[in-house]
Amino acid sequence: DAFNALFEATWLINETHGGENHARLLNYIEYAQSNDLSIGVAMTDGKGDRSKRPSQQVQPDSYVHVTERRADGIVISGVKAIITGGPYMHEFLVMPCRRMQPEDKDFAVACAVPIDAPGITIVSRPAGRPGNPAAMFSAKFAQSVAVAYFDNVFVPMERVFIDGETDEAHIMTTNYATHHRHSCIGARAGFGDLLIGAGAMIAEANGLDYEKTPHMREKMVDLIKITEGFYACGIAASTMGVHDAAGNFRPDRVYSNIGKLLLANQIYDMHRLAHDLSGGLVVALPSPDEDHNPSTAAMLSDVLRGHPDVPYQHRANVARFIEDLTASETGG
């Protein structure tokens, strides 16, 4: 998403102002691909006082900005507040998160920085819930989100893609939103598929048959409708995409944004429907420690069984899986 956004922006900079910005980006993309690097997108700034522009902030480090320009590069300072996978990336792509006016020129900066560059401090929470037996998903699959503070970090010129070009920086931000919302549709559709499958399993474990339980069937239909609805927007955005000015493919903006609006608003309905399909055990089930407690294991296995042909342990595992996805510190 970030590379796609920068592709057109740097091309436009060269077309309008001249320079080597686009060539630098292409060289960096080749470098990242050749070395199989994981690149974290450092885009969302701390933002400070939301009523003020970046250049009006009492604390200028609320936004990443250029503090010094040298012949061989730039120096940047400021905070990026939400970096997915931050601690386990090789490098950060630093990019502006909003439209910059001419007075915000120093804040219109995009560049590539190794995460161990001098002056970077990364603060993060652990990814998921490793080692937690109740975390049926996030014990193995999760993501960490980082805050990164750049304290006068030097960036060589060959890694600088945007520096003060506010109009092109705005185009980059808009393009990134389109690409990222498009890819987010696929991610959330996959999440919806997990809930649909888990909902089918928990109903069976609870002893219910969708063919004979109309109100449950309606909830499952709603869950499928929501998931496939925004996924269809993703398909439409893909098939109706166009080539941008630089010749790069861009998904359709309208369907990318409609899909993102649908999933962002209806993710809460997806959680609610998963809970309706599951029942109270999702949040009330005893700890997995009790599954092996000789004083309670046999009793729980007997009285908390649902369908007689479905073992209690399977019912418990599915319930904990849904809890992990929808009602835990990771997915709630």
Model-derived features: positions:
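Glycine-rich beta->alpha junctions and the first turn(s) of the following alpha-helix
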Residues: N132-I226
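Beta-sandwich/jelly-roll carbohydrate-recognition scaffolds of carbohydrate-active enzymes
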Residues: L26-I29, S51-Q56, P60-H65
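Internal helix-loop-helix
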Residues: D1-I39, G85, E91
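Structural beta-strand/beta-sheet cores of well-ordered domains, especially the beta-sheet scaffolds
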Residues: L37-I39, D72, H90-F92, F107-C111, ...
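A short, Trp-centered hydrophobic/proline-enriched beta-strand micro-motif
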Residues: D36-D49
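Long, well-ordered mid-to-C-terminal structural blocks that present hydrophobic/aromatic surfaces
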Residues: F191-D269
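Alpha-helix capping/hinge segments and adjacent helical runs
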Residues: V254-G332
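A short core secondary-structure module
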Residues: V79, I83-G131
